[in-house]
């Protein structure tokens, strides 16, 4: 019976431990907190969107992927995840493809994982920081105990209050790995533009286009939240990993916002002409009434240098074009992103080209990785938890059988 140490008692670590134990291994989970699964409780705003029915590798980012993400997801996919938790007692709730536990509380997921850990006799070493890992023969000495295999599932640097502080990267470096710089992802976008204070609190459906050094990179869509420092909301979060990387490499990151149903500037200008024709005497201040929030409307007019008291019917073609440009092509230069304390996941980590298809290290046999410690981060919607389940399953099974 192989003795396996799992470093980290989060989602990927617990899945790795459970999988290894089911395959006959003697498993010990080392967790620096006084309880396991602390970060799980924060997922999905506490509701725990634990997977998604629309799942493939295109929803993940990695600057070192060589096809491994797709292979890992195929070994334990979203259907396997749903079945796994159903067998533990979770009834799934489908919300537009996002899968939640029926009571929509993360404690339900953590509770069944705890019960399975107990049922399988997995040992928990809590409030335990790893002081040393040494090689011994074909195995390892963790602190003072021998193990045949080690699975590093210590997470990244996001949400440090849950215990994620980059310890996994330090361990990886001891064995010759070169983790890519850890950066915040799934976090707010910060701009130096002063006008954001005037529109803080506004929410609007929008299409966002990301440009790095003037080159189009990616598009997203959803509810955008405007804050006093910039952009928030899922659609902006989905661009944050790429923006983080761009800014870190000293490139210009710019987001173009279309506030009106992805309509072209030409078509929106025509829409304005029709509105003006109906009520040409209406003051420009009221031109967007029924379309946009007042705060946003006033900003559009200000950016187009249009007087609030001017009759809509007297707006010239240049002013209409400028207004349409403000609405459909609102450009925001991003100066930075939210820090690790505000981010949901980490971009960067152990490069995928430094592990094999079972997530075993190419540098040291018997050393495996799972979860956020690897150079993989997904968008919002259950994708990062699916990566945790899939990678944990793959590492746990391989470690037990290797």
Each language-model region and where it sits:
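N-terminal Rossmann-like FAD-binding beta1-loop-alpha1 element of flavoenzymes
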Residues: 3-29, 395-400
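Short hydrophobic core segments
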Residues: 5-7, 30, 130, 146-161, ...
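An anion/pyrophosphate-binding glycine-rich loop and adjacent beta-alpha core
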Residues: 28, 34-36, 41-42, 50-57, ...
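Glycine-rich active-site loop/strand segments that organize a redox cofactor
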Residues: 45-94
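A glycine-rich dinucleotide-binding beta-alpha-beta segment and adjacent secondary-structure elements
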Residues: 126, 297-377
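A conserved short coil-to-beta-strand element within the FAD-binding core of flavoproteins
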Residues: 126-139
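Glycine-rich loop(s) and the adjacent beta-strand/alpha-helix scaffold that form part
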Residues: 149-195
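A conserved FAD-binding loop/helix module that cradles the flavin
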Residues: 158-171, 175, 376-402
């Amino acid at each position: 019976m192989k003795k396996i140490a799992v470093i980290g008692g989060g989602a990927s670590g617990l899945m790795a431990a459970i999988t290894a134990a089911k395959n006959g291994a003697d498993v010990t989970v080392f967790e620096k907190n006084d309880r396991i699964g602390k970060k799980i409780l924060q997922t999905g705003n506490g509701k725990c969107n634990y997977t998604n029915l629309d799942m493939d590798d295109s929803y993940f980012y990695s600057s070192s992927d060589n096809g491994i993400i797709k292979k890992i997801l195929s070994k334990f996919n979203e259907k396997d995840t749903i079945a796994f938790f159903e067998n533990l007692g979770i009834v799934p709730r489908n919300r537009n493809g996002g899968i939640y536990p029926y009571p929509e509380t993360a404690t339900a997921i953590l509770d069944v994982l705890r019960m399975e850990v107990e049922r399988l006799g997995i040992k928990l070493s809590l409030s335990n920081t790893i002081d040393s890992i040494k090689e011994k023969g074909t195995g390892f000495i963790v602190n003072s105990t021998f193990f045949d295999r080690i699975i590093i599932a210590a997470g990244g640097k996001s949400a440090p209050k849950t215990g994620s502080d980059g310890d996994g990267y330090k361990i990886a470096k001891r064995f010759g790995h070169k983790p890519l710089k850890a950066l915040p992802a799934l976090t707010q976008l910060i701009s130096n533009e002063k006008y954001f204070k005037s529109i803080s609190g506004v929410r609007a459906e929008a299409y966002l286009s990301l440009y790095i050094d003037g080159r189009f990179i990616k598009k997203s869509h959803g509810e955008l939240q405007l804050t006093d420092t910039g952009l928030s909301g899922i659609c902006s979060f989905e661009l944050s990993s790429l923006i983080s990387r761009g800014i870190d490499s000293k490139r210009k990151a710019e987001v173009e916002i279309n506030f009106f149903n992805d309509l072209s500037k030409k078509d929106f200008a025509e829409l304005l002409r029709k509105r003006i024709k109906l009520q040409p005497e209406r003051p420009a201040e009221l031109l967007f009434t029924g379309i946009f929030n007042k705060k946003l409307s006033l900003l559009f007019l200000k950016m187009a240098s249009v007087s609030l008291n001017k009759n809509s019917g007297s707006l010239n073609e240049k002013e209409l074009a400028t207004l349409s440009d403000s609405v459909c092509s609102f450009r925001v230069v991003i100066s930075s992103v939210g820090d690790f304390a505000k981010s949901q996941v980490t971009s960067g980590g152990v490069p995928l080209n430094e592990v094999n298809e079972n997530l075993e290290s190419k540098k040291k046999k018997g050393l495996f990785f799972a979860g956020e410690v690897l150079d993989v981060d997904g968008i919002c919607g259950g994708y990062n938890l699916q990566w945790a389940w899939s990678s944990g399953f793959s590492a746990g099974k391989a470690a037990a059988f290797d």
